[in-house]
């Protein structure tokens, strides 16, 4: 294990890191960097307050910190802060000497080329890695499922990508980005709870509401029925105990919260909802490959974990096909096949696919961009990673 390639999946909300062959990330922690609001307190409880707090450490004392997310919508926006996160990853968590090691990094589709170049430059020049490979997250999610073609719906904390892939090649001209994801759903749940009189306004409360969302929220299959149930019965009502011991009642908010994925206007976005986005993406593909895409709609990322999401997507995509392609003719509907791949481990699908790929590549030095190639060719060395969008 000591010499195995490192697999690092940088997400907007969480960093996932481990080694080739691992079935799960060794470590997962929030992608946050915090600095104390006041320097007066040196210690709180048994946590030492430092000038820069990162990841789990920052999360533990979040209310005392000015918190920054170095990544937005899946893309690194602040490399200075990102270096703090990477230092924490390699030296505090993995406790390794990165010099001469191999590392597989992940990137979103449509990641700006300059970003990939800066990321690789940092790995070679700041940390001294011997080999670097950058893989597109959606392709790794497919590999985790043992597939090479399909539409990956990768919904994390900061962004949802809809990525059609055919025979391991991303169809870049069709990649879609829906700027509604986990963080938006959490904010929306905060506003729904506020209407009930429960105020969550501190940064520390955000984490509390996120956990509540993950435990209680689900995607409604039939909105009218759920609305009726919440209005006329207490079937949907759940008690939830907050960290300070208070108990609150959560009812209709359980299904209203994830609804922002299907109705983005609820969180101020003018984009189409998730089902329509997927349908439009596949319909824009070449007619010969559409059937392969419909038969492998692969869910990936933490915001795809809601109970009820796969069946709602299937129902709405079939409905869209019925209305827009068949124009309401039910005779041909049985020939239309949709399959939603909802693997139980899809929260970590990108990491799992990365660990599989890094293991296959471990003994094939020519597949990695080496430090020697970087020193000789500079950013041109990255051409061997294959064509990428600019």
Swiss-Prot record:
Species annotation: Schizosaccharomyces pombe (strain 972 / ATCC 24843)
Annotated protein name in UniProt: Actin-related protein 2
Gene3D superfamilies xref list: 3.30.420.40, Actin, Chain A, domain 4 (3.90.640.10)
Superkingdom in the source lineage: Eukaryota
Family: Belongs to the actin family. ARP2 subfamily.
Locations listed in the record: Cytoplasm, Cytoskeleton, Actin patch
Single Gene Ontology BP annotation: actin filament branching
GO cellular-component term (any): cell cortex of cell tip
Broad class of the protein's primary localization: cytoplasm
Subunit structure of this chain's protein: Component of the Arp2/3 complex composed of arp2, act2, arc1/p41-ARC, arc2/p34-ARC, arc3/p21-ARC, arc4/p20-ARC and arc5/p16-ARC.
Residues making up the signal peptide according to the UniProt record: none
Function: Functions as ATP-binding component of the Arp2/3 complex which is involved in regulation of actin polymerization and together with an activating nucleation-promoting factor (NPF) mediates the formation of branched actin networks. Seems to contact the pointed end of the daughter actin filament. During cytokinesis it colocalizes to the cortical actin patches until spetation is complete. Has a role in the mobility of these patches. Essential for viability.
